[in-house]
Amino acid sequence: MSKKQGKPEYVTAISNRKARFEYEILDTIEAGIELLGSEVKSVRLGKASLSESYAMIHHGQVWLENMQITPYEHNTLDTLEPKRSRRLLLHKAEIMRLQSKISEKGLTLIPLKAYFNKRGVLKIELGLARGKKLYDKRETIKNRDAKRQLQQLRKQY
């Protein structure tokens, strides 16, 4: 069967693949994000990136920094800056809990995944993370390679 030409392909999730390699994820939390209509359309088309982005708490609000959203090509209004700060929507108690945990040395908020829930609302999965040391990263690579070799051996036999 042939695919319809006029309908665009929608992406269900955008992930930050480097985050789990470079950080040890201690806890995860789901947050909403405040976007404009043209930005939502771009994210639905998969024109967004979470690499090198992070979240910070400023004046009791959580902000997502450096999330790249390419401007929507059919937007007739003025274009927005692709890497502007975007507000994340959390309950005040959750923000206070995150603030107390972030005040510990070495912890940060990293976006792990952006996805649309069942109602079609864009959500960001944040991870409370601690940076890995170089030897931890090497160990991760070693474990990944060992798993890959086991999978290849299983396929052969």
Curated annotation (Swiss-Prot):
It is found in: Cytoplasm. The keyword RNA-binding applies. Its main location: cytoplasm. Pfam families: SmpB (PF01668). InterPro entries: SmpB (IPR023620), SsrA-bd_prot (IPR000037), SsrA-bd_prot_CS (IPR020081). GO terms for cellular component: cytosol. Keywords: Cytoplasm, RNA-binding. One of its GO terms (biological process) is trans-translation. The keyword RNA-binding applies. One of its GO terms (molecular function) is RNA binding. Belongs to the SmpB family. PANTHER family: SSRA-BINDING PROTEIN (PTHR30308:SF2), TMRNA-BINDING COMPONENT OF TRANS-TRANSLATION TAGGING COMPLEX (PTHR30308). Required for rescue of stalled ribosomes mediated by trans-translation. Binds to transfer-messenger RNA (tmRNA), required for stable association of tmRNA with ribosomes. tmRNA and SmpB together mimic tRNA shape, replacing the anticodon stem-loop with SmpB. tmRNA is encoded by the ssrA gene; the 2 termini fold to resemble tRNA(Ala) and it encodes a 'tag peptide', a short internal open reading frame. During trans-translation Ala-aminoacylated tmRNA acts like a tRNA, entering the A-site of stalled ribosomes, displacing the stalled mRNA. HAMAP family: SmpB. This is SsrA-binding protein. It comes from Chlorobaculum tepidum (strain ATCC 49652 / DSM 12025 / NBRC 103806 / TLS). The lineage of its organism: Bacteria, Pseudomonadati, Chlorobiota, Chlorobiia, Chlorobiales.
